[in-house]
Amino acid sequence: MNHLLEFYGTECPHCVRMHELVEKLEKEEGIKIESLEVWHNPENEKRLLELDKEFCGGVPFFYNLKTNKWICGETSYDNFKKWARGEDFNQEE
């Protein structure tokens, strides 16, 4: 199992924009992120709710299982890359 998780909704425009950053990160840095659709998959939705703990309350939601840090919504590519690497990042960006 990958330690970086992306929770998204198929019809979510913010999720579509952030998934472009996921693909860029995977291509440029070789960092893999497990993508989990939650609007049409009850098992993935349950996992989201377990990890989210009302931090975000929606998607896109990104969770790093190694650092227990998350990103809610959209963020910049540089901030996203720092989160994925386990570096200090701006959780409010």
Could you tell me what each predicted segment is?
Residues 41-57:
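Short Fe-S-cluster ligation motifs
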Residues 35-39:
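Residue-level recognition of beta-strand->loop/alpha-helix junctions
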